[in-house]
Structure formats: structure tokens, C-alpha cells
Amino acid sequence: VSSLEEIDQLKEICNKTGKIIFPVFQYRYGPGFSKLKALIKSELAGKPLVASLETHWNRGKEYYSKAWRGTWKGEQGGAILSHSIHIHDLITMIFGPVSSIYAKLSTRVNDIEVEDCAAISLEMGNGALVTSSITLGAAEDVSRIKICFSNLTVESGGSPDKPYNPADDTWKFLAREPVTQNQIDEVLSNVQLTKSWYAGMFEEIGKNLDGLTSDEVTLSDARQSLEFVTAVYDSSNQGKNINMPIEKGNPLYKSWIPKK
């Protein structure tokens, strides 16, 4: 699937047949996000304020030596689609839908067709503001998340050992008055940790298939991610802020891949 049109067609087929598609967003599963969800549910976190996201990875000549990589035909996109789609899914999982996007994309690291650097500014539907910094020209692979709520600051460790599974990294959860650190720590001590990464994802799919309460990724979640990608390319192409949602009349609804 490489367009909103295609995923809407899939949703229509699922609705008609009763079949279920389980998209793959394995970053959602692990102790870091289990703890954050518990704090949000406890209402200790408070109002979402801002967040910063970093996808700073190292992809050079060896990675792009395969002819299909770095091309619109082979990958349907660059770092926005192939490398940072998961971290953007995470922020929508935490903060909810995006309201507007402004994006600047550039190819600064490799001699390829698609982008390998980006700076993105988001306004969320709840009013929170988010920045996302992306490059494939870093010395090592690091995925880092920092989120500020009115009563809580959360930061993932950004370890180069966990770039593809940030939920398994070491996280900080710091209280801000009037909430105390003891209150935060008490919630954290009672969190039942889930399985991480693919194991966690497939466990939730299994629960769904067994008719149990589950937290699987839905096709609507996947559509939200593709709408994000579409808006990023639209913003970069036009050099302006793009409001969500993306309507069917948008020129990129059928495909964000540039026409030759």
C-alpha cells in the first residue's frame, strides 16, 4: 500500500468480507510505553504540552548499494516512509491525531532519489506541539523521544543499542509539581509489563482472534500513518502548512510518488 486511496480500498474490502488486517507497528510494545500508558491512565501526567522526536540513523553507500533502495519505485519514499514512520506512529498513539503538519525534506547524505533528512513541525488535535528531526547521516543509530506533560516529563534513553525498539530502552519519568515523584513511582511499581516488539504485537493479535480484550494495531491506525506521510510530502512540495485530514480531492490522495 502506497497511498491513501489504496488503504481506503483495503478498508472497504475488509468491511465487505469481515476479514481483518493487522498492520505491523512493533515499536508500540514494550515496558517504556506500558509505563507511559499507565501514567496517562492514572491522570497524573496532566495536559500534553510538547514532544521532540529524533530518528538519527546511519545509512550510507553499502546500504544503498542495492539498486531498489533509495528509489521511488523500489521504496515508495525515503526516510519519512522507511525509517521514521514508526516513531511518528508512536506520537499519535500517545497524543492522538495530528491537526497540521509543516515539513522540510532534503537529500543531503546519499546520492539517491528520495529524502534522507527532514525537519517536521506538528500541531496535534489536543493542541500539543511536536518536532521531529530525521537524518540518515548520523554516526550511529539513535531513536529518542522526549515528551512534556504539565505534570510529567518523559524521556527515552536514546541508546544506540535500541534504535529499533525504543520501548525496551531505559526511560525517565520525572514528576512536576503539584504531582510528586512518589506518586509517579507508585504507579510505575504496579505496571504489569507486556512483551516487547514483535512478541508483544503478536500476543495482542492472538488476544483479538481469541475474542479477548486486546491492544492490536488496526487498519485505521495504519491509515493515520499513511495520512501523515501524505501530508509531509504535500507540505514539502508546496512549502506550506498542511491541515488534516487529507481529503480525497488532494492531489496526493492517489499517490505521493512524484510524477515523471
Predicted regions and their residues:
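Short, hydrophobic alpha-helical segments
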Residues: 95, 202-213, 230-237
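Beta-strand-loop-alpha-helix segment that lines the small-molecule cofactor/substrate pocket
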Residues: 1-28, 43
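C-terminal glycine/acidic-rich active-site capping loop/insertion
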Residues: 146-220, 242, 248-260
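Active-site beta-strand termini and strand-to-loop segments that position acidic
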Residues: 120-127, 147-149
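Aromatic/hydrophobic pocket-lining residues that form π-stacking "cages" and hydrophobic walls in ligand
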Residues: 10, 36, 231-232
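Predominantly a Rossmann-like dinucleotide-binding segment in NAD(P)-dependent oxidoreductases
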Residues: 27-111, 239
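Glycine-rich phosphate/pyrophosphate-binding beta-alpha loops
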Residues: 85, 133-141
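C-terminal capping/lid region of NAD(P)-dependent oxidoreductase domains
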Residues: 19, 46-50, 234-260
